[in-house]
Amino acid sequence: MVYISNGQVLDSRNQSPWRVSFLTDFFWGIAEFVVFFFKTLLQQDVKKRRGYGSSSDSRYDDGRGPPGNPPRRMGRISHLRGPSPPPMAGGUGR
């Protein structure tokens, strides 16, 4: 890419892609990515502390917690069954 610096037209192809400033910027970019990645893994409540939580998060602030699971039904639900599957193919080959 061509650019102008101090009144001179310069071409970026003349610069090495492995110059020191590029390598240090690349290193710090990778380091920041790793730090932020592990911060998000270890701090799951970061949304609540920064005010991004939804209003539904405040429903259980009285200490009761969310309601438990509904009671388990005994037996099978037969009225929602569809047609029975077709018989298995194969046989004894005679």
Curated annotation (Swiss-Prot):
Post-translational modification: Cleaved by CAPN2/m-calpain in resting macrophages but not in activated macrophages. Macrophage activation up-regulates expression of the calpain inhibitor CAST/calpastatin, resulting in inhibition of CAPN2 activity. Truncated SELENOK proteins produced by failed UGA/Sec decoding are ubiquitinated by the CRL2(KLHDC2) complex, which recognizes the diglycine (Gly-Gly) at the C-terminus of truncated SELENOK proteins.
Highest taxon in the source lineage: Eukaryota
Major localization listed first in the record, in broad terms: endoplasmic reticulum
Ranges annotated as spanning the membrane: 20-42
Alphabetized UniProt keyword annotations: Calcium, Calcium transport, Cell membrane, Endoplasmic reticulum, Ion transport, Membrane, Selenocysteine, Transmembrane, Transmembrane helix, Transport, Ubl conjugation
Biological processes, Gene Ontology terms: calcium ion transport; establishment of localization in cell; intrinsic apoptotic signaling pathway in response to endoplasmic reticulum stress; macrophage derived foam cell differentiation; neutrophil migration; positive regulation of chemokine production; positive regulation of defense response to virus by host; positive regulation of interleukin-6 production
Loss of function: phenotype: Normal growth, fertility and immune system development. Reduced receptor-mediated Ca(2+) flux in T-cells, neutrophils and macrophages. Reduced T-cell proliferation and reduced T-cell and neutrophil migration. Decreased viral clearance and increased mortality following infection with West Nile virus. Bone marrow-derived macrophages from knockout mice display decreased uptake of acetylated or oxidized low-density lipoprotein, reduced foam cell formation and decreased palmitoylation and cell surface expression of CD36.
Leader sequence residues: none
Subcellular location: Endoplasmic reticulum membrane; Cell membrane
Induction trigger: By increased dietary selenium. Expression is significantly decreased by a low selenium diet.
GO molecular function: identical protein binding
Chain spans, region Disordered: 46-94
Gene Ontology CC annotation, any one: plasma membrane
Topology with respect to the bilayer: Single-pass membrane protein
Protein family per UniProt: Belongs to the selenoprotein K family.
Quaternary assembly: Interacts with DERL1, DERL2, DERL3 and SELENOS. The SELENOK-SELENOS complex interacts with VCP. Interacts with ZDHHC6.
Protein name from the UniProt record: Selenoprotein K
Encoding gene, per UniProt annotation: Selenok
